[in-house]
Regions:
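Short gly/ser-rich loop at a beta-strand->alpha-helix junction or flexible surface loop bordering the NTP-binding
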Residues: 1-123, 257-260, 264-324
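Surface segments flanking catalytic/ligand-binding clefts of nucleic-acid enzymes
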Residues: 110-324
Length: 324
């Protein structure tokens, strides 16, 4: 009788196997090389040769989340959850559930949720469930994912808290039956938020198509707002964008959470750092590093008070946190 136990590709190495897009240069350095890692589903002692990284998993039901030589993405999401910050993990989840033209998606948010809820006791489960709360299917680009995070995440995670936003909603026009997909869509006010990539929207033909598309949508009562990269990188432009969206959606952005400041900076790091480490939670956020929404003045005073307590009493329980 053979004692051979099958091993399966694990963790970040499995992200490469499943070809999850736009990880390097966003949450990993552009030249990152993931080590070969495997998992074996057993609760028995195991010989681990020096040439391979082998993990064991004894959680009942985990063994069904495999396909071919690798763990499936719902299980991989749990395996890597503690390797990333909460913002990086949300971004990863959006990319895992991103749209693939002409093919089924790699994974869906519901599949991630079912796996995380089922595998009680798995490493990273609690953090994964927290991230899954903010995920949405069908992102078509890394910048769509990041724009979605800026607008959808709650204030305590650095976002605007526009909870209705969904990604790539299908819109079928009554007049002529034309079909469009909205990059980000708010159903209650028929608002289409389009991310204009400099790579794909700078040609005359693309600009002409965009204008025609906007005209068709606006003729049937939809409102279209275009967002460029500079509106995300420039704080004043971003504040003006949020004010415009706030008026159209009918939801006021009012900051009460002191964690807004460090987490907004974390989102900016995700946008600008290109896969290199996010700022330390122990580095103070200054006034010029965030947009001045309503409520920011009072909330920033609370943030500074918490920061000063941390500086004076560094050995006491952490009073200023960004989720690890």
């Amino acid at each position: 009788m053979s004692g051979y136990i099958e091993k399966y590709i694990y963790g970040k190495f499995a992200l490469d196997y499943w070809d999850v897009p736009a990880i390097r240069g966003k949450i990993e350095p552009p030249d990152a090389i993931f080590p070969e890692e495997y998992v074996i589903f057993t609760d028995k002692p195991l010989y681990r040769p020096d040439r391979a990284i082998i993990h064991t998993c004894s959680i009942r039901g985990a063994e069904k989340y495999v396909e071919g030589p690798a763990c499936t993405l719902p299980l991989v999401f749990l395996q890597v959850a503690l390797d990333y910050t909460i913002h990086e993990l949300i971004y990863l989840g959006l990319q895992i559930c991103s749209y693939r033209e002409g093919d089924r998606p790699r994974c869906t948010v519901e599949e991630l949720r079912i796996c995380a809820e089922e595998l009680r006791g798995h490493r990273g489960r609690r953090k994964a469930l927290r991230a899954i709360r903010y995920l949405c299917d069908n992102s078509r680009s890394p910048m769509e994912s990041i724009l979605y995070m800026f607008l959808r995440l709650p204030n305590a995670l650095g976002g605007c808290g526009f909870k209705e936003i969904v990604l790539n909603e299908k819109i079928v026009l009554e007049d002529g039956g034309k079909t469009y997909f909205a990059d980000l869509y708010v159903p209650s006010c028929k608002l289409d938020i389009e991310y204009d990539s400099e790579e794909f929207h700078s040609f005359a033909s693309a600009l002409s198509r965009d204008r025609e598309r906007a005209a068709h949508l606006e003729a049937e009562g939809f409102r279209v707002v275009s967002v460029g990269y500079s509106q995300l990188t420039d704080l004043k432009a971003f504040r003006n964008l949020v004010r415009q969206l706030s008026r159209l959606i009918g939801k006021r952005v009012f900051i009460r959470a002191r964690k807004f400041f460090e987490n907004f900076v974390a989102l900016r790091d995700l946008l600008l750092r290109k896969g290199y480490s996010l700022r330390s939670r122990f580095r103070k956020v200054h006034r010029h590093e965030f947009p001045w929404y309503s409520g920011v003045r009072a909330a920033y005073k609370i943030y500074l008070a918490a920061w000063n307590r941390l500086v004076r009493h560094p050995n006491l329980p952490l009073v200023l946190t960004r989720a690890p």
